[in-house]
């Protein structure tokens, strides 16, 4: 079966593994998924990210993060810009997720950035997802 939206699939796999309290998640690799995983690690939503080379496209191993009492660090993931309806925002209109408690992941001319980084670099772009 052909996957029409690999980013939505990646976010759904993270959401499902998080809801099931899994420690580790493995997904087929792509450059944009690597970028999203690195942003999630940098922003503290996941513990660690590993990239495993194989005969094909590679695998991304994501280590999910939980609090001391088992509470979930990622409470929500939402795909914003979809293949059928792209969502672009100018630098003045960049969204704030939960008044700054969450992040928006954007694809910009500077690469994949969070909403805060895009404001600092003064660039807009395609809103990929919200994470909170």
Swiss-Prot record:
**Source organism of this protein record:** Streptococcus gordonii (strain Challis / ATCC 35105 / BCRC 15272 / CH1 / DL1 / V288)
Please name the SUPFAM superfamilies in this protein's record: Ribosomal protein S8 (SSF56047)
Q: What family does this belong to?
A: Belongs to the universal ribosomal protein uS8 family.
Gene3D superfamilies from the xrefs?
3.30.1370.30, 3.30.1490.10
What is the protein's name according to its record? Small ribosomal subunit protein uS8
Q: Which UniProt keywords apply?
A: Ribonucleoprotein, Ribosomal protein, RNA-binding, rRNA-binding
HAMAP family linked to this entry: Ribosomal_uS8_B
Note the subunit structure: Part of the 30S ribosomal subunit. Contacts proteins S5 and S12.
Any GO CC annotation of this UniProt entry: ribosome
Q: Name one GO biological process term.
A: translation
Looking up NCBIfam families in the UniProt record yields: PRK00136.1
Q: Name one Pfam family in it.
A: Ribosomal_S8
- Record flagged with keyword RNA-binding: yes
Instruction: Please provide, alphabetically and separated by semicolons, the GO molecular function terms listed in this UniProt record.
Output: rRNA binding; structural constituent of ribosome
InterPro entries for the chain: Ribosomal_uS8 (IPR000630), Ribosomal_uS8_CS (IPR047863), Ribosomal_uS8_sf (IPR035987)
In UniProt terms, what function does this protein have?
One of the primary rRNA binding proteins, it binds directly to 16S rRNA central domain where it helps coordinate assembly of the platform of the 30S subunit.
Its lineage opens with: Bacteria, Bacillati, Bacillota, Bacilli, Lactobacillales
Q: Which superkingdom is the protein from?
A: Bacteria
Query: Which PROSITE patterns does this one have?
Result: RIBOSOMAL_S8
Task: Please state the span of the N-terminal signal peptide per the UniProt entry.
Answer: none
């Amino acid at each position: 079966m052909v996957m029409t939206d690999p980013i939505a699939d990646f976010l759904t796999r993270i959401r499902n593994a998080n809801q099931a309290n899994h420690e580790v998640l493995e997904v087929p690799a792509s450059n944009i998924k690597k970028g999203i995983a690195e942003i999630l690690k940098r922003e503290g939503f996941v513990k660690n990210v590993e990239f495993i080379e194989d005969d094909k496209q590679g695998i991304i191993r994501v280590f999910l993060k939980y609090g001391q009492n088992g509470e979930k660090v990622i409470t929500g993931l939402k795909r914003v810009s979809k293949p059928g309806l792209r969502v672009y925002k100018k630098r003045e209109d960049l969204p704030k997720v939960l008044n700054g408690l969450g992040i928006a992941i954007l694809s910009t001319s500077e690469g994949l950035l969070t909403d805060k980084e895009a404001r600092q670099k003064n660039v807009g772009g395609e809103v990929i997802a919200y994470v909170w």
